[in-house]
Amino acid sequence: MSMVYMNIMLAFTMSLIGLLMYRSHLMSSLLCLEGMMLSLFVMASLMILSTHFTLASMMPIILLVFAACEAALGLALLVMISNTYGTDYVQNLNLLQC
């Protein structure tokens, strides 16, 4: 396995660990999710280019479209939560609290 693939896997792992550790603020969770999506995009693009599998060449573009939709929804939710509660804590998203 080359160093490029190892670095991309390390970036994905670090983003996943960051998502698991810093899940109290919504902004840090969104940044970690974006890091995970970016590393998945780069990994998918490199895999398709290295195997010359042209039938799946649209997969990274579709992944980027879903990542952009996820980012837009996440930022809209962040703005709504910060305007309503004044903070970006994820615990404010719990609908079961009184």
From Swiss-Prot:
Which EC number applies? 7.1.1.2
**Membrane topology reported for the UniProt record:** Multi-pass membrane protein
Catalytic function, reaction form: a ubiquinone + NADH + 5 H(+)(in) = a ubiquinol + NAD(+) + 4 H(+)(out)
Which cysteines are disulphide-bonded?
Answer: none
Q: Which GO terms describe its cellular component?
A: mitochondrial inner membrane; respiratory chain complex I
Query: Per the UniProt record, which residue ranges are transmembrane?
Result: 1-21, 29-49, 61-81
- Main localization is mitochondrion
Q: What does this protein do?
A: Core subunit of the mitochondrial membrane respiratory chain NADH dehydrogenase (Complex I) which catalyzes electron transfer from NADH through the respiratory chain, using ubiquinone as an electron acceptor. Part of the enzyme membrane arm which is embedded in the lipid bilayer and involved in proton translocation.
Q: Which family, according to the similarity comment?
A: Belongs to the complex I subunit 4L family.
Could you tell me what this protein is called?
A: NADH-ubiquinone oxidoreductase chain 4L
**Which species is the source of this protein?**
Vicugna pacos
